[in-house]
Amino acid sequence: MQFTPLLTLTLGLFLTSRATTVAGPAMNIVVLLADDWRSDTLSCAGNPVVKTPQLDRLAKEGTRFTHACVTTSICGVSRASLFTGQWMSRHGNRVFEAFKTPWAETYPGMLRDHGYYTGHVGKWHNGKFPASQFDFGRAYAGQHWMKRADGTPIHVTQRNEDDALEFLRTRPADKPFCLTLAFFATHAEDGNPLQYLPQKETLSLYQDLTIPLPKTATAEALSKMPPFIANNEKNESRVRWHWRFDTPEKYQAMMKNYYRLATGVDTSCGRVLAELKKQGVLDNTLVIFTGDNGYFHGEHGLADKWYPHEESIRVPLIVRDPRLAPAEAGRTDDALALNVDIAPTILAAAGLQAPVTMQGRDLAPLYLSATPPTWRSEFFYEHTPLCDKNWIPSSEALVRKDVKYIYWPDFKQEQLFDLSTDPHEENDLIADPAQATRLVGLRSRFAELKKAVQ
């Protein structure tokens, strides 16, 4: 299908005090996707340590969602949800296999079918990279330090940046474009004793700082986890905790290098944005920055992700939309935005109708409309990995901003947290008689939401 330029991308819904008209060709799309980047790893989110000036500026020019979450906290599954707009129960990807959803129903596939020049750069964690489905594809394996064709070393973040800039500089000028830049950072190099290997340019950062331990990075907090985690040193989140955080010295070294990797990604994001501005297309480009999952930094005695706790499921989400009136830029929005909302948001910005298979929603009305729509107040979380339950147990949850009901299906165990009074999930209320009536309602709603996403 040939692409037909739109006279304007502003729909009637957006002709309000929060929107400005963007006339001309179809909107370009750039998705900046970080790895294992939890929601508070931004200085604009209140983090007192990490330096992210470029992403802070992006937030000032757009909208930052303060309660963005993933529906499954693991890279391959979450990325499948981001591309397809579907929960794991529907797209069927439970590990790192190729997409089961038809490619024509993903956002890159639909955009290419409608005349977009599409590119993917960096991490691809869903089977063999489908190079033929993109006009420009640079996906590769590896973590942190790699080698160029001539054998000289290059950091993977620099390679991600270089490939993204090549896409932008070689793209055809007569087509709208969509670039997904999937950074490898801040993922650890599992198996390497150092875990995090940042760029040389960032090694001087954070040297003289002492990074505070999280409130729940304690043996007591671990003891409150279910016994199949707390008393199981074969549990992968405990294994990786020992890799990274089991001594104060190790914690400081790991966290400083994690933040150095984050600052390196921030710098590369800034250079991509600068290239868009240099080419005169920034103000006709929807830019989205987000992460594939959250991350435990020792909270509850854990490392990595997988589970439905706040540190694991919450991710950064910044949307810079050129339709947003300048006076409205820099706002935050506490709506429950999800990774499944990214694909419908992209397609709507391109003037396309999301396929009925997509379960997410267009985020734009939340920040463009003077009277934002009624939005979800809860969602179903799921993670059912294809592995031994003693290594990574399956977990499900009903998540609201003020309460969370967790179910561990492998062990038929429940947990209940009142997030309004216990935001760090320290006090499990599942056995509290005062919660009995509330629990009946939560169990019922949990079952309804689980069925609805299938």
PLM feature segments, named:
Residues 420:
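Conserved, charge-rich beta-strand/loop surface module that forms ligand/interface-binding patches
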Residues 2, 19-408, 413-414, 423-444, ...:
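Formylglycine-dependent sulfatase
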Residues 4-16:
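Bacterial N-terminal signal peptides
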Residues 417:
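Extracellular C-type lectin-like domains
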